[in-house]
């Protein structure tokens, strides 16, 4: 459903794909969030939810990291969930063998491409890294699995070298090539340029984007890459991940589906449910103002806004909350107006006589000025008091 009426920019994006694969890496890159470590049971719970959600790929983990990680990845692979199950591996036979032993459908092979990583982390020349990348892809492909390749820190690599590496691994048999913005330094304009530059090297294979959020641009960069022709996005639920996190699954999917009319295969009505599950398991709360899944996203307090939303929700909401599994909330406070109170009273089954509405509104504003939040229970208390006082006044008038 395209919800931007009157805007046809998407139709002018000649490289915009009609469908995009959602590659979820919550269980791998998301688990690299400082302080987060999933048990096998927790990984299985999240994997089942991701399958229910409808992602194309689930990166279940990095089998070479530990025996527990290996067992968790293997358990997920044996669940028969539906999505492609992927394991991460460095560009060496040991890691690839471990991934193969985990019975996964695909192996995500990576090696550094930027000079800073090659010099200070791997202590390796460009030529050596290129040779290892090609050998690793050939080795993995020889075992009959799907292979995705990532030139780590690709957005800081020399462009010509990056092009050469992508072309070489594609010639070696890579099925997909992912471009990682490892430290989140891209901007949407630069990401579009980079993806357009790399596409010829991929020779028709799927190009993917993997964006980190160090400057708050992970989602924007992911969308920009897709607008330029990338056909897959790496994401995590709630945007969890190391440092500032990754591109948030719920935000990328919603933007693609509702702003660009690009199909993702994801059941958007399960986005909120999925977000809550991951938040509960990780212990990381969802910020109230987080796009798509935050509590405030479909909440309204301002009298002008509430009046508009009651008459037509699209006055102050870009999509219906039910489209992402959310619900609308009318919040009462000092910014509230008569229509908001009337709506709240009607929702709770109370009379909406003008005198009751105005007296409740006065009390709501008084409490708001004191910094007191009017919860549903507090509102009931206020209404009951107003109704009680009205009855006493009636009795006094007739006595």
Curated annotation (Swiss-Prot):
Question: What cystine pairs are annotated?
Answer: none
Residues annotated as binding a divalent metal cation are: 29, 210, 212, 246
Q: What class of enzyme is it?
A: transferase
Q: Name one Pfam family in it.
A: HMGL-like
Q: Which UniProt keywords apply?
A: Amino-acid biosynthesis, Branched-chain amino acid biosynthesis, Leucine biosynthesis, Metal-binding, Transferase
Ranges of residues in domain Pyruvate carboxyltransferase: 20-272
Pathway recorded for this protein: Amino-acid biosynthesis; L-leucine biosynthesis; L-leucine from 3-methyl-2-oxobutanoate: step 1/4
Under catalytic activity, the entry for this protein gives: 3-methyl-2-oxobutanoate + acetyl-CoA + H2O = (2S)-2-isopropylmalate + CoA + H(+)
InterPro entries xrefs: 2-IPM_HCS-like, AIPM/Hcit_synth_CS, Aldolase_TIM, IPMS, LEU1_arch, LeuA/HCS_post-cat, PYR_CT
Q: What is the designated name of this protein? A: Probable 2-isopropylmalate synthase
State the organism named in the record: Ignicoccus hospitalis (strain KIN4/I / DSM 18386 / JCM 14125)
State the organism's lineage.
Answer: Archaea, Thermoproteota, Thermoprotei, Desulfurococcales, Desulfurococcaceae
Q: Gene symbol?
A: leuA
């Amino acid at each position: 459903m395209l919800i931007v009426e009157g805007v046809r920019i998407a139709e002018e994006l000649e490289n915009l794909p009609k469908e995009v694969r959602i590659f979820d890496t919550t269980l791998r890159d998301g688990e690299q969030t400082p302080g987060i470590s999933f048990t096998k049971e927790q990984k299985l719970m999240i994997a089942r939810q991701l399958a229910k959600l409808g992602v194309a790929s689930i990166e279940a983990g990095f089998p070479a990291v530990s025996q527990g990680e290996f067992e968790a990845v293997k358990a997920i692979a044996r669940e028969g969930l539906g999505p492609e199950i992927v394991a991460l591996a460095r560009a060496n036979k040991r890691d690839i063998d471990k991934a193969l032993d985990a019975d996964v459908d695909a192996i995500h092979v990576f090696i550094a491409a930027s000079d800073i990583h090659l010099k200070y982390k791997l202590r390796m020349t460009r030529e050596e890294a290129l040779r290892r990348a090609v050998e690793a892809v050939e080795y993995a492909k020889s075992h009959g699995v799907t292979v995705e390749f990532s030139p780590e820190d690709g957005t800081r690599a020399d462009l010509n070298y990056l092009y050469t590496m992508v072309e070489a691994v594609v010639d070696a048999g890579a099925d997909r090539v992912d471009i990682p913005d490892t430290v989140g330094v891209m901007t949407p304009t630069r990401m579009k340029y980079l993806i357009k530059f790399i596409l010829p090297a991929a020779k028709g294979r799927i190009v993917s984007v993997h964006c980190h959020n160090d400057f708050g641009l992970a989602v924007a960069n992911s969308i920009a890459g897709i607008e330029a022709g990338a056909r897959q996005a790496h994401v995590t639920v709630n945007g969890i991940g190391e440092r500032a996190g990754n591109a948030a699954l719920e935000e990328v999917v919603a933007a693609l589906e509702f702003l660009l009319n690009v199909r993702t295969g994801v059941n958007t009505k399960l986005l909120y449910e999925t977000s809550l599950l991951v938040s509960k398991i990780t212990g990381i709360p969802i910020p109230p103002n987080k796009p798509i899944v935050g509590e405030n996203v479909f909440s309204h307090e301002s009298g002008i806004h509430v009046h508009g939303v009651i008459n037509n929700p699209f006055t102050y909401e870009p999509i219906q909350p039910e489209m992402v599994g959310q619900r609308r909330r009318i919040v009462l406070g000092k910014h509230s107006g008569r229509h908001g109170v009337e709506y709240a009273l009607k929702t709770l089954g109370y009379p909406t006589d003008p005198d009751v509405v105005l007296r409740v509104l006065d009390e709501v504003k008084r409490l708001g000025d004191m910094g007191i939040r009017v919860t549903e229970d507090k509102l009931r208390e206020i209404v009951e008091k107003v109704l009680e006082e009205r009855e006493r006044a009636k009795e006094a008038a007739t006595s």
